Amino acid sequence: MEGLDINKLLDISDLPGIDGEEIKVYEPLQLVEVKSNPQNRTPDLEDDYGVVRRNMHFQQQMLMDAAKIFLETAKNADSPRHMEVFATLMGQMTTTNREILKLHKDMKDITSEQVGTKGAVPTGQMNIQNATVFMGSPTELMDEIGDAYEAQEAREKVINGTTD
């Protein structure tokens, strides 16, 4: 046992596969302050839309790439767990597709709506579409519709199928 050198035993430089490569150290994340324009939200809206859309498409591409790998792995492994992981990934891809379409709908809704800022002066114009307006006195309205109790009774009769 005298010929045993602990330093020689701990030296792993001659083991195959060990090249002494340096491990890449990533720089810490530096957060950047986002500029906001509360008086003119159009640039903010366009920037945010671009960021969200880009992120969703990148996510979709990564999911598709992973799906190809996972499908082959699931086929080769013949394992229910691998198929379950693949099915979960497919569900996530479907969700991302829906979110991309929802983003377009939301953007359309946002851009078609007229949003004013705090300092904006109201124009006095009102745009009402598909509104039913009753022209008459309150008594005539009560005769037409009835009070809240009568209206509730009428709804219950319709629901229960006991209309007269």
Curated annotation (Swiss-Prot):
It comes from the Viruses. Residues 36-114 are annotated as: Oligomerization. InterPro entries: Phage_T4_Gp16_DNA-pack (IPR020342). Residues 1-35 are annotated as: Helix-turn-helix (HTH). Residues 1-35, 115-164 are annotated as: Interaction with gp17. One of its GO terms (molecular function) is DNA binding. Disulfide bonds: none annotated. One of its GO terms (cellular component) is viral terminase complex. The N-terminus contains a helix-turn-helix (HTH) doamin that is involved in viral DNA binding. The terminase small subunit binds to the packaging initiation site and regulates the ATPase activity of the terminase large subunit. The terminase lies at a unique vertex of the procapsid and is composed of two subunits, a small terminase subunit involved in viral DNA recognition (packaging 'pac' sequence), and a large terminase subunit possessing endonucleolytic and ATPase activities. Both terminase subunits heterooligomerize and are docked on the portal protein to form the packaging machine. Homooctamer. Interacts with the terminase large subunit gp17; the active complex is probably heterooligomeric. This is Terminase, small subunit. It comes from Enterobacteria phage T4 (Bacteriophage T4).
